[in-house]
Amino acid sequence: MSKIGKFKEQDITVIPHNKEKYMSFSIGNLRFIDSLQFLNSSLATLTKNLADEGQKHFNYLSKTFPDPDVFSLLLRKGVFPYDYVDTEQKLEKPCLPSKEDFFNKLGDTHISDEDYQFAQTVWDKLKVKTLGEYSDVYLKMDVALLADVFEKFRDISLHDYDLDPCHYFTTPGFSWSAMLKKTGIVLDLITDIDMMLFVEKGIRGGVSSIFHRYAKANNPYLFDTYEPTEPTSYLSYLDANNLYGWSMSQCLPYGHFNWLTEEEKIKLDITKLKADGSDGYIFEVDLEYPSSLHSSHSDFPLAPERKHIQVEHLSPYSKELLQNLTGKQCLTKIEKLVPNLYDKEKYIVHYRNLQLYVELGLKIKKIHRVLKFKQCPWLKKYIDFNTEKRKNAKNEFEKCLYKLMNNSIFGRTLLNTRKHKDVKLCHTEEKLNKETAKPSYASCKIFNENLVAVEKKRVNVLMKQPIYVGFCILDLSKFLMYDFHYNHMKSLYGDKIRVCFSDTDSFLYHVETEDVYEDMHQYQDMYDTSDYPPEHFLHDIENKKSNR
């Protein structure tokens, strides 16, 4: 960035994360995009994944190093003593630095014997005379390998989606266009500010909580620790396959938003609303959490809320710890997503979740507002396409790509344009004076005498993302987790099971039963057991990677 200020005759524009970090920048008609915004893995990982499919995809590397033996040698990420080279004179060193000189301060890691031997082999094979020449080889390798990886990504994208990612800045932006093209859906944008704020208020992330701090299994399959005189119990970690993929395959809103009238709210029978109906609803309600449920629901309470935890919410022991360990008598003001047993006021919730909460014992005290919309499983076609592609992928490179294409859709639906930055790069005194004189001026970052980044306050915000889709995806993911816990696990084991912790799409259970594997076998249609050893009686590929 320190050099681009010298292009005085060209306009310089950026798409910023902040004053110093940019997603992309342009000099005149030349645009620079960041490959990391598309392929968010190390070059070492990307190269290895692509190499697993063979050498045929490394066209740029073979052109850069045409000797077949050298080409075969360089089919991996190179290594370089970054911290050692702190002066130009060291580039004149006539031999490879010692293994200790390859220590990476940034990663606080030493180079492996295998990597050092690779560096020595490259030095010898290419008849390198100085560390400077080795640096040239290293850089040519990096550029050629990244070019080959990105070209493979482009080939797949053009073949599967008929779109070129080079016309985009990030994978989420590219995947969003691919989804719109593949599904043909037209999404209405909310133009009513009250509806927008209503949906925003209901957005809550995944539940990540520790509910039970210590549990010890008495597992008969673990002979060293099993106590025959004690009740048999297991620690069972279960993970939902592609949780958000499942949510994105459900009926989702696409338009025709309107508030229900008082009369329509009275006539609406929540219990009779269909999961796959053409009409969907988002409710704002007051909920009562009956005290009779508190004991059985204490390890995974329904209807989690974003809350500021107050000192009065803490137990006497926790208050004492707060004082002794921090010297403070107050807590952070950062909101947390908290599962709790309190009654809820003006709780915004998807209708399917509300149906489940009522079925499990919560009571609706009052309905404040109801937002109605049209819905259908419009995203399912795209999700299924990528899921099937991932299932049939020939290598890790393609598996990661198709997974990313699905996951990035969810993130795109929750893109918060309020957080976007407005940054101008000024490379002339005239432009700098103009930008800093504006009332919207906020701050600046001086790179050098030729370049200054000026950050401005946002004058307006365009709310152009269908965040109502993201809200529904998040709530439906909670529906699946609560439904599985209460209507399967809790129904099966009763008070013999406890949630130790939950993290968005997973549970760690402490369950008291004679044989948890036999229990799973009875409900094998609910589980993906394809990763069990082939000789295990639970091994079955029927539900491999399935999210049904």
Model-predicted regions and their roles:
Residues 1-548:
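Conserved acidic
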